[in-house]
C-alpha cells in the first residue's frame, strides 16, 4: 500500500497557490489550518503563522470562499484543521454544509471531546464530511478501541506528548502503540507532530500508513524558494515510498 503524505499549511493569502504546489508534488491529502486566536495544539511556528494570517484578515469565510472559487486547482483531497469554537460560532449545521459545498474531505478538530465528535458524526454524517479521529500516545487502550471503532477517513496518531514541530523525539512506545491501533483499525493510521526530516519519515514509516508534516512545511513556505520546497517535498515522498 502506498503511504499517505499529508502536509499541513496555514490558511492564508497564499492558500490556493501553496495547496496547488503541494498537490502537484506528492501530497495525498492537504491539511489546511484555520487561523484561531487561541490555538492550544499548535507549536510556535504554526502559532506565528496563524497570528500572521489573522493580521492579514483571514477568516473561515475567506478560506471557504477561496476553496469555493479555486478548490478545483487542488488535485487531491483536503481537510480543515480547526478548533470547535470556530465551528460553534459559525453554526454547526451551516459549517458542515459549507464544508460539503467547498469540497472539504474532512475535519481535524484537536479540542473536540470524543463524545461530542460522536454527536457531530451522527447529526451531520449526511454531508459526507469525515471527522478525523486523533489518538494521543497517552490514550488508554479502552478509549483507543472506542475511538478506532468509530474512525473515518484516517486516524491521526499524535507521536509526541508535546505540541507540534518540536525536537522530533518519538515516544519510546510509539511503534508498539501504532501497531496495536492498526491491528483493530479499518482506516489508515498516520503519524504526525514532530516529523520534519527524511530520517524521521524513514523511522516512522515502518509502522505508520502515512505521515503528517506541519511546522516544517509552514517554515519552508515562509523562507524557501519554490524550487527548494519542491526538492524537500520530493525527498519526503521518495523516503516515504521507497
Curated annotation (Swiss-Prot):
UniProt pathway: Amino-acid biosynthesis; L-tryptophan biosynthesis; L-tryptophan from chorismate: step 5/5
InterPro entries, alphabetized: Aldolase_TIM, RibuloseP-bd_barrel, Trp_synthase_alpha_AS, Trp_synthase_suA
One term under GO cellular component: cytosol
Record-listed E.C. numbers: 4.2.1.20
Job of this protein: The alpha subunit is responsible for the aldol cleavage of indoleglycerol phosphate to indole and glyceraldehyde 3-phosphate.
Assembly: Tetramer of two alpha and two beta chains.
Protein name: Tryptophan synthase alpha chain
Species: Staphylococcus aureus (strain JH9)
